[in-house]
């Protein structure tokens, strides 16, 4: 037996017991004739003591020579610490060591293995196996495990079966780019890695598996950002014989179960619901952060027609009221203007108005507006003395709302309104079924081609497809879309109509999705489902800024695994075996 206990479990109740611990040397401290070693494993840290008054000199000499991250085994007696450490669970005890074996030496690590480390992101990703030794990173993995366990418990209790679906599938043209895999046995043909198990879970519904789930890897070849990775994990679910209310109730229940068991937060009230139209109108986003108010107010009627050309020519003028932010300095306001002018936001400028203590309004465009008009602005914004009104305008309504959304989030962060330990949950419903692409002059599915239109909107498919609402829904928490889904089309004729509107010829639809349309001919039940992003859930509960920090071996923002140096070139022999030839990149 290598060890009798872990480095996180010993307490005063274990005094005078002889124990054996194994782990990594966190740090070594020498004080007079004593050497203190902090020994760390997955479970915690325990202090070891090598005392020259009671331990062999040879043992104490070896203890002094220990280096950081050496792997050792130590046997000794549990003693009460004279100088206790209240910051760790084992802080009341220490081990008076009588025997020690060095199991493996370590080179000096390239960064400190501490919560507050001196290693940058790139260096820590290159040595991810060392980064995972840090308590803060390891705790994210433990949280991920507990959440996956609770998901399985809840869904099993609701009668769901966990069923695995294939990883090598057929490539489809909709959505993000596929990762493709050449087939050696079928020259010139390719598999794709699944962007989701969408079609397979629908086939499982046709097969009679009325409640399915799996925690599954998915792959999308798209540009990366803080909440995206080329491979990510979904909690994928589907149900038969359900309407939208059944799905929302089931998975709202799962969310509440996770809050209760993981965060110890009891949520009794139903999640609010907001239409997509209202989310875009009042927040400029289909995933609004409702931890704080600051809703958009349209100001076209108030501010147009006063010889201020920026507003007079605008297709949209919108404002937010930042309560209590009237004390913002000119420097802070200039910084906000610079923020909205950044290429990532794209606004041309920002107008502000401050409500003074006497109720008067002072703005950055006073020469164009009378105090009477500014008071009308104040009333429209419901602003009070000490408040700050921030206004953006533009010639594209949707684009300007998105810019105002970025400004709202930035101001909310500056005012401390986006507390990571406060949670605001809601459902966003009634999405458009289609979105129009001006460049290609065609409709695209806002979610995917299998999303059902709302029954009352089906007649509009022939007359006004852009007005059709989808039977789709997203769960949003703190401005993060943690999950989304829809009621699916289960009728072959309606599915064919959907393909036509998306520009598929009957031949193309049959080639891409014939297997699904054929299955629908054999008694497909009404069905719908939802997929949660496990990575996003974990990062939300852990208070992380990026999902990368809750994935054991993530990719960087260029989609590379710098630890194993992937992707990489392959041998010419492998290329020939796969009937592939590389074309030089002329860029």
Swiss-Prot record:
Coiled coil: none annotated. Belongs to the class-II aminoacyl-tRNA synthetase family. Type 1 subfamily. It is found in: Cytoplasm. It comes from Porphyromonas gingivalis (strain ATCC 33277 / DSM 20709 / CIP 103683 / JCM 12257 / NCTC 11834 / 2561). L-aspartate binds at residues 174, 220, 447, 488. The lineage of its organism: Bacteria, Pseudomonadati, Bacteroidota, Bacteroidia, Bacteroidales. PANTHER family: ASPARTATE--TRNA LIGASE, MITOCHONDRIAL, ASPARTYL/LYSYL-TRNA SYNTHETASE. GO terms for cellular component: cytoplasm. Disulfide bonds: none annotated. Pfam families: GAD (PF02938), tRNA-synt_2 (PF00152), tRNA_anti-codon (PF01336). GO terms for biological process: aspartyl-tRNA aminoacylation. It is an enzyme of class 6 (ligase). One of its GO terms (molecular function) is ATP binding. Its main location: cytoplasm. Gene3D superfamilies: Bira Bifunctional Protein, Domain 2, GAD-like domain, Nucleic acid-binding proteins. It comes from the Bacteria. PROSITE patterns: AA_TRNA_LIGASE_II. It catalyses: tRNA(Asp) + L-aspartate + ATP = L-aspartyl-tRNA(Asp) + AMP + diphosphate. Its EC number is 6.1.1.12. Keywords: Aminoacyl-tRNA synthetase, ATP-binding, Cytoplasm, Ligase, Nucleotide-binding, Protein biosynthesis. Residues 198-201 are annotated as: Aspartate. Catalyzes the attachment of L-aspartate to tRNA(Asp) in a two-step reaction: L-aspartate is first activated by ATP to form Asp-AMP and then transferred to the acceptor end of tRNA(Asp). This is Aspartate--tRNA ligase.
